[in-house]
């Protein structure tokens, strides 16, 4: 549907049944994937939007993550956080499976880069603590050590050196248990 006036477009869109809207968004997403297969990166954000509106959780998650990655590479840190947060919100409506928990861990780790560049804006602590919780739930020692390291840095930056040190010590123990030198080395730097 093409309308020249935004108000007419909005009225026409809102007059469609929700089921029909979802179908249209899904078809638009598929058409973009087919037509622009060679240069999909240019359309990640649009695909995330259409697949979210179509309630295609798998594709919406995929394109929200890719949009966040793209924004991070382009130093658009606030945009990156918004896309990653969208992926987290989408996952929160999905079944509580191990795969979805792993996706939640992945997204929260990806969020840590823009959060660090933005000096940990409001809500950052909750993101990191949720990542720590998910890592403990599925027994993923590597991601747990990463979140403990991030929490150590967070509290150090926020002026709570004691709590930061506690997380650093716990991180080192976890990294030592996984025998991952890449996780042990950054702890001393922070």
Set out the residue ranges of the language-model regions:
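Glycine/alanine-rich phosphate-binding loops at beta-alpha junctions
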Residues: 85, 89-97, 102-104, 109-116, ...
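Alpha-solenoid helical repeat architecture
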Residues: 39-44, 75-79, 99-103, 138-150, ...
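Amphipathic alpha-helical segments of tetratricopeptide repeats
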Residues: 30-34, 68-69, 86-96, 129-140, ...
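Short coil/turn connectors between adjacent alpha-helices in alpha-solenoid helical repeat scaffolds
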Residues: 13-20, 57-61, 69-81, 99, ...
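Short secondary-structure boundary elements
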Residues: 1-82, 86-94
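Surface-exposed alpha-helical interface segments used for non-catalytic interactions
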Residues: 65, 78, 82-85, 105, ...
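Tandem amphipathic alpha-helical repeat scaffolds
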Residues: 11, 49, 67-73, 106-120, ...
């Amino acid at each position: 549907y093409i309308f020249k006036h935004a108000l007419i477009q909005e009225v026409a869109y809102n007059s469609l049944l929700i089921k029909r809207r979802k179908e249209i968004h899904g078809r638009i997403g598929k058409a973009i994937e087919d037509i622009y297969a060679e240069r999909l990166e240019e359309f990640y954000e649009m695909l995330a939007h259409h697949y979210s509106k179509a309630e295609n959780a798998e594709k919406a998650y995929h394109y929200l993550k890719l949009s966040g990655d793209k924004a991070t590479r382009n130093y658009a840190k606030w945009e990156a956080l918004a896309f990653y947060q969208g992926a987290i919100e989408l996952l929160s409506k999905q079944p509580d499976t191990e795969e979805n928990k792993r996706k939640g861990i992945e997204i929260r780790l990806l969020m840590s880069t823009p959060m660090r560049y933005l000096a940990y804006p409001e809500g950052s602590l909750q993101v990191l603590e949720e990542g720590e919780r998910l890592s403990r739930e599925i027994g993923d020692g590597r991601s747990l050590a990463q979140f403990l390291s991030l929490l150590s840095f967070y509290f150090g930056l926020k002026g709570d050196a004691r709590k930061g040190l506690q997380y650093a010590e716990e991180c080192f123990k976890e990294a030592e248990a996984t025998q991952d030198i890449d996780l042990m080395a950054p702890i001393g730097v922070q």
